[in-house]
From Swiss-Prot:
Membrane topology qualifier: Peripheral membrane protein
InterPro entries: AAA+_ATPase, ATP-synt_VA_C, ATP_synth_F1_bsu, ATPase_a/bsu_AS, ATPase_alpha/beta_chains, ATPase_F1/V1/A1_a/bsu_N, ATPase_F1/V1/A1_a/bsu_N_sf, ATPase_F1/V1/A1_a/bsu_nucl-bd
EC number: 7.1.2.2
Source organism per UniProt: Zymomonas mobilis subsp. mobilis (strain ATCC 31821 / ZM4 / CP4)
Protein name (Swiss-Prot/TrEMBL): ATP synthase subunit beta
Molecular function (Gene Ontology), one example: ATP hydrolysis activity
Residues reported to bind ATP: 156-163
Annotated region (Disordered), positions in chain: 104-123
Keywords noted in UniProt: ATP synthesis, ATP-binding, Cell inner membrane, Cell membrane, CF(1), Hydrogen ion transport, Ion transport, Membrane, Nucleotide-binding, Translocase, Transport
Catalytic activity: ATP + H2O + 4 H(+)(in) = ADP + phosphate + 5 H(+)(out)
Amino acid sequence: MATASSKKNIGRISQVIGPVVDVLFEEKLPPLLTALETKNQDATVVLEVAQHLGENVVRTISMDTTDGLVRGQEVVDTGSEIRVPVGPETLGRIMNVVGRPVDERGPIGSKQTMPIHADAPPFTEQSTDTAILTTGIKVIDLLAPYSKGGKVGLFGGAGVGKTVLIQELINNIAKGHGGFSVFAGVGERTREGNDLYHEFLEAGVIASDKDGNAISEGSKVALVYGQMNEPPGARARVALSGLTMAEYFRDQEGQDVLFFVDNIFRFTQAGAEVSALLGRIPSAVGYQPTLATDMGQLQERITSTKKGSITSVQAIYVPADDLTDPAPAASFAHLDATTVLSRAISEMGIYPAVDPLDSSSRNLEPRIVGDEHYQTARDVQEILQRYKNLQDIIAILGMDELSEDDRKVVGRARRIQRFLSQPFHVAEVFTGMPGKFVQVEDTVRSFREIIDGKYDDLPENAFYMVGSIDEAVAKAEKMAAEAA
């Protein structure tokens, strides 16, 4: 940070109000976003300059707890923004918002650091190539396909399966992916972060020595955590720290990087907390007035260039299941594909609880996925929509009052609904069912055959929690044999 030869710019704490610390500088004021450091017992606390108040006082946001800080203690201006370690040394490590290791394995030993605030790549550098990313999850690959170098949002309320879905995507994509991945845990449960680390170790995504201890050499993922118990400053910046590490692999090493964020809503929530602490007048629903700007600055950096790509998967919590809430609504415009998780579908016991009519992708076009895939997806949505429209009639009058054609549609829709469920690898310990990875060709063929009525005679339960259609047929035969 500051070089030994340069005279240090030193200030003193004049006020501490929770995570907000005011610092008085007698000489030179540090610019906005500069990192300051102060000692708190044995630890070094990083403060980021947020406002110039006048009278030589700067208002800063702490990246760590301020318990123990006192008025009058020294604060050192580092002369630069918060910088985090980048490069291969970060792989296999767990770091906090300022890039310090929290996995008790000693210093990172990185040869290079980069500031967490940066501009998005210029238009001339950006790439517009489209290639489909296979996830192995039927409902996603068929109805809302993801693209390499694209941005994906997993929207859902509390407890409908966002984290399980993001972990399955990590399992299916990151494990088979040759390049590197970065996972940013933003304001989520520490337990989930710990579970994910151990899953990566078991799967070999984080390499280990003969004693089972994690090592950087051979590891494929860097983890950056700023979890629920951290102050708002850390939660508002940890996504940027993770993104900076991903940008290094994209720009300096020309890699195709996977960037997972759980949860983007907590980034916005922390921004709202910081905004209130800084005394800004809130906008709609109490969010910060800079909501769209903050989101844009983060999202515009997550992009593909001619050197490499960043494919990002972001879990986005939806407060009170309201997709029109300003926080989830602010991220819609930035995404290439949206996967919406529905409480109504999860209550039916269908997992992943993806809403096939609400989820969308700009990649679902004949020129990208092909005519057969496109037509099958649209036919599936049409059948499900007709079923939805008929549900009121069924509830009031019963199935007997429907026409023959409508009864066929309802039967196929119910089979499709169940067939959109799928056992996950990461949920094997809970469900007792082995996880399934289904190739896109099998998915398209299976749904086309259901639409064409080839399996109208199979019981609906045969389609529940299976992989390809061949497994559904085998399950139906087994059910028939057991019933006989």
